[in-house]
Amino acid sequence: MPKTIVREEETIEETLRRFKREVSKSGNLAAARKKEYYIKPSVEKKNRRNKMSLR
């Protein structure tokens, strides 16, 4: 998890913006969203096949 230290004379908005940027770069949020629901391996394979056929 990214850590953000508040710098001197930095507003909360700037710190929050910096923190959001670090979180998006780390990919933690995307990984958490991906694992939000369990997808059966057979369904995952079916989705991959459909995705490849669309290309």
Curated annotation (Swiss-Prot):
Pfam families on file: Ribosomal_S21
InterPro entries: Ribosomal_bS21 (IPR001911), Ribosomal_bS21_sf (IPR038380)
Protein name as catalogued: Small ribosomal subunit protein bS21
GO cellular component: ribonucleoprotein complex; ribosome
Biological process according to GO: translation
A molecular function (GO) term: structural constituent of ribosome
Family per similarity comment: Belongs to the bacterial ribosomal protein bS21 family.
